[in-house]
Amino acid sequence: MTPLVKDIIMSSTRMPALFLGHGSPMNVLEDNLYTRSWQKLGMTLPRPQAIVVVSAHWFTRGTGVTAMETPPTIHDFGGFPQALYDTHYPAPGSPALAQRLVELLAPIPVTLDKEAWGFDHGSWGVLIKMYPDADIPMVQLSIDSSKPAAWHFEMGRKLAALRDEGIMLVASGNVVHNLRTVKWHGDSSPYPWATSFNEYVKANLTWQGPVEQHPLVNYLDHEGGTLSNPTPEHYLPLLYVLGAWDGQEPITIPVEGIEMGSLSMLSVQIG
């Protein structure tokens, strides 16, 4: 077992698991309801010894994990102010934690990525508010685009063990994410279907039963599911956090809101 994992495995404080609605990259530069919520989480939650991030913006064929000592800050967006591109989040990586994930997720093959990726705005865009000093070791786990929703929920179950090792699970996405219907100007009130789906998610956070029957695994069965998520990558991170729930811990909503008609900023806290 690697030294880092040996050190943290005896942690007596169970770390929470978070799903954060990250929204626009502009949140990095702004002070608003959502960014203040992320700041409060960083100030009030137990400080983790390391963080595993699942971001909507690393959507791959197969599963990968960042395994470099100093992951780069990825500015995976275009058309924003230069100040955003000048912002970096130099949190250290953790090859030891990456190797721990390889062992924990076996027999699922996990590729150790030492050069292709880093921390994208789905991860650093929220963590720069939670932990602005960028001094907590982090790895980012990719989302396998070839797998069904139930598989991602089960991945959360596997990752749950890390919470007892001093490691926080942070998943970043948006449960309603339809950029084709975003209201860029004028009336920005939520579409009825966006509100309906957002409420459906909230109502089923504590559902218990067979994974294959979970309403949030079968989210496309909801009448607003496809409109709310024409592609799955921003929704699936939620399932990692729900999979890490033990069925008894409190589930709370640190902040919520729907911006520009069809962008949910709902956040969910486990523990």
Swiss-Prot record:
Cofactor: Zn(2+)
Pfam families in UniProt: LigB (PF02900)
Keywords associated with the record: Cytoplasm, Dioxygenase, Metal-binding, Oxidoreductase, Zinc
GO cellular component terms, semicolon-separated: cytoplasm
EC number: 1.13.11.29
Bridged cysteine pairs (disulfide): none
Enzymatic reactions: L-dopa + O2 = 4-(L-alanin-3-yl)-2-hydroxy-cis,cis-muconate 6-semialdehyde + H(+)
pH-activity dependence text: Optimum pH is 8.0.
Recorded GO MF terms: ferrous iron binding; stizolobate synthase activity; zinc ion binding
Chief location of this protein within or outside the cell: cytoplasm
Quaternary structure note: Monomer.
Full protein name: 4,5-DOPA dioxygenase extradiol
Species, as recorded: Escherichia coli (strain K12)
